[in-house]
Amino acid sequence: MLFRSLVNGRLTPALGDHVIPVGDIIGTAVRQYLGTALPLLDTTAHLVIRPRVSHASSPGAVLGQTASQPAGRRFWFAPRSLDDLAERRRMFSNDTSAGVGYAPFGIAERLAAGIESHLTSPDSLAARPYFGTDVKLMVIRDGRRVHVTACVPQIAGLTPDLEAYQARRAEAREIIAGVAAGLAPGCEVDVAVNTRDDDVRRELYLTAIGSSIESGDEGVVGRGNRANGLISMLRPMSMEGVSGKNPVYHVGKLYSLAAQRAAEELHALTGRTFAVALVSQSGRDLEDPWQVLAQASGDGPVDAGLVRNVVAGVMGGLDDIRAGLLAGKIATA
């Protein structure tokens, strides 16, 4: 079984005469990440990495004599020196887009995030290595009744027979019910696991490495979870993908995380549910959103001054978000 990882986008292959080994960097990053996410995948023997990268300038680059031409779009991804890096002079938005965040999570969201996190935690996988990591959940709440449908893969090489599979499927159901009881006390929760299984035909959710990616599923940035790890259909969201983007000035990444942080701070200060949208304008100062929209629960008025102060504080602290991203401390999916 051979897996292919396609890496697309623009990268800087050199700074002047100093060559940057982008191929090695890509290979190391992909193998490290997939090795962690899919521990049964042999990233040396069964993974082919195909970079499709460019250092082409952005639209609007002005061509001309290279030596005398000042820094601009032409040299954005092919800098002659540090002086060609526009972000050293001014941090600006790379695109016209929007980031959206909200707080707090509702019951269904807490369950979806908590159950998935529990089942895929290192401790859980160490205790139950026969479960895969590609866990998917749909959670619907109707008043105090909560319906959970889960897809929990099992590792074929560690599943000797149908009886073992059935017992572990039941075990997964019990684990989910237990986690749900702790996260949503007072709710009546029903749980279904691997509803597509046909035990008679032995069509089961068995995988070699613990993910449906091995049978043709693909993962594309922007298609799927938001920055908070969820796809909440009745919540405000943008279609911006957070993963795979530059943490320095890509608004699809920074504004999504900043909006989430602002919503969380506003909720903590007021106790009200908040949704925040930050809208950029291409070329505008990154710390100065073009538009800010805030929505709060309840009948009373929203303190506009409080919202402005919180958003200004978050935007002034973008360096903290960048540092957290580079340190791997902020989740992006």
Identify the residue ranges that each predicted region occupies:
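Conserved active-site and cofactor/substrate-binding residues in soluble primary-metabolism enzymes
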Residues: P21-A29, G106, R110, A167-I175, ...
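Glycine-rich, mobile lid/loop segments that gate access to catalytic sites or pores
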Residues: T28-A184, V191-T195
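Long, contiguous, structured domain-core segments that constitute the functional module of a protein
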Residues: V200-G252
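Hydrophobic alpha-helical bundle architecture
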Residues: E240-D285, Q295-G300
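Internal helix-turn-beta structural module
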Residues: G271-A333
